[in-house]
Amino acid sequence: DNVIVLNPSLDDLLSDNVYMLDFEGEKYYVPLWHDEIYYKCNNNDLIVKCIPDLPENITIDDNNNLIVTIYHSFNNILNDIQISCGKYGSSEFLIPISELKIQKVQKYVFKKSGISLINHNNMYDNTQKSNIIFVINLHQ
């Protein structure tokens, strides 16, 4: 078996980028939102692993949901209407303060705004999106 490791960026994942891999004279088109794909190459398996290069505060769960941990000062958000969670891909994510609770750690979900879900029947299908889950840590 041959194993190739690719390190896509977060923007690659959110943009549904497909990488063209040239291996032993053959071209393989790798959808970067998959974590592992198997191809046949000259009677052997070619395994392509996608291990994203992510910031420390971001992880990806088994359902391709993005988990983004952010920290905000409780005192600072009292005067704001919304908090900016950052720009991911081409979208900026803003959470209305009115939807937050008075608790130290909470989650806020942007449904169907994340990475493409894995379709085992069509690996290039990018029509269904995962969620982006912000884990908000409030501190003094």
Language-model features, listed with the residues they occupy:
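Intrinsically disordered, low-complexity linker/assembly segments
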Residues: 12-140
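Post-J-domain flank of DnaJ/Hsp40 co-chaperones
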Residues: 1-14
